[in-house]
Design a protein with these regions (language model features):
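Cap/lid segment of the alpha/beta-hydrolase catalytic domain
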Residues: 108-179, 237-238
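N-terminal cap/lid segment of alpha/beta-hydrolase-fold proteins
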Residues: 58-95
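N-terminal secretory signal peptides and thylakoid transit peptides that target proteins
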Residues: 2-19
């Protein structure tokens, strides 16, 4: 793994050297895919573009740790994708022993390209005052947050430039983000203080979208909490509101294979809590209605209607105090 900071030119140039992962998920019949969750996951993964091989070696180097507000914060540099290092934080309870539940925290966008994983320890204006690193460690959990492509210490290249450079090479920015989340999960579950049978993922806005994509693709995720970005794609199209989401959000040909509800159905019957603002333009209410209706049917068919819940609040794009309490209660119940 490279020890020096990657330059914009070096990263853009090295993207073309990625290996292509062969998949068979899109070769089956539509009927088979519709009734076989494994086939549907393979189909969804295939839409992520030319990501590195899923089984390429991944590793991490611990750079240090410090005591912070009742927990221990570890700083890591991960080798996940073979293109550029991935900075990460891991927060663990100060007084804890044995294996603990683990949470993959997915940071938001909000135009804060320089922020990235710092949201985990510092919070954001649209989140409740207690940062999630403290909230989760106070619950006795171990949690990880990485800098995603074009954010935090990886903000050397603009979102638009990275999206276009990847597109030229058959890659998808969102696909590379999801890939990094999957590989970070691989490493996180190898920790001696993490119980691999008790893993959750949680995020706000872009982090919300990452949470439900990650859980849809990775059955090791037992609990999903998505805050304010359970967007129905057709509702967004109908409102002509595509510009409200960053370009990172758009995956070629996605709508010819999946609706948002169909992606989220791959999480069932695992526990899933969605939270939404009734005045949030990123999640049109009619789209929330559609997703909620379909997922209620899916979870009922699995015999676990209690594992799906969509809570709505009379706010715009923000987490509420009531929502934070509901999130904590949901994690305590299902994780």
């Amino acid at each position: 793994m490279c020890d020096r900071a990657m330059t914009r030119r070096a990263v853009l140039g090295s993207l073309g050297g990625l290996g292509v992962m062969g998949t068979s998920g899109m070769t089956g019949t539509a009927q088979t895919a519709a009734t076989d969750p494994a086939a549907r996951r393979a189909e969804l993964y295939a839409l992520l573009g030319q990501v590195p091989p899923r089984d390429r070696p991944a590793s991490g180097e611990k750079l240090g740790e410090a005591s912070r507000d009742g927990y221990i914060l570890e700083t890591w540099r991960l080798d996940l994708n073979g293109v550029e290092p991935v900075p990460a934080y891991v927060a663990r309870p100060r007084q804890a022993s044995g294996r603990r539940p683990g949470v993959i925290f997915d940071h938001s966008h909000g135009g804060g390209y320089a922020i990235g994983k710092r949201e985990f320890i510092e919070g954001r204006s649209y989140l409740q005052p207690t940062p999630y690193a403290k909230e989760l460690t106070d619950l006795g959990y171990v949690a990880i947050c990485i800098d995603h492509w074009v954010f935090g210490e990886r903000s050397h290249t603009s979102e638009a430039d990275m999206f276009k450079a990847m597109l030229w090479r058959g890659q998808v920015l969102w696909g590379m983000m999801v890939y990094d989340s999957l590989r970070a999960t691989d490493l996180f579950l190898q920790r001696d203080d993490v119980d691999p049978a008790r893993i959750a993922t949680l995020g706000m806005s872009m982090g919300s979208t990452m949470a439900w994509w990650l859980a849809a693709l990775d059955e090791r995720i037992k609990v999903t909490v998505d805050i304010n970005c359970l967007t129905d794609f057709q509702a967004l199209l109908d409102r002509k509101a595509l510009s409200l989401h960053g370009v990172y959000y758009y995956v070629p040909a996605l709508l010819t294979h999946f609706t948002a509800a169909q992606i989220n159905a791959l999480i069932a019957p695992r526990a899933h809590l969605g939270l939404a603002g009734l005045r949030d333009k990123l999640t049109p209410v009619e789209g929330l209605d559609r997703i909620d209706r379909e997922l209620q049917q899916v979870y009922a068919a699995h015999g676990h209607p209690e594992r799906w819940s969509l809570l709505r609040y009379d706010v715009e794009h923000q987490e509420t105090a009531e929502g934070r309490k509901a999130i904590v209660a949901f994690l305590q119940r299902f994780l």
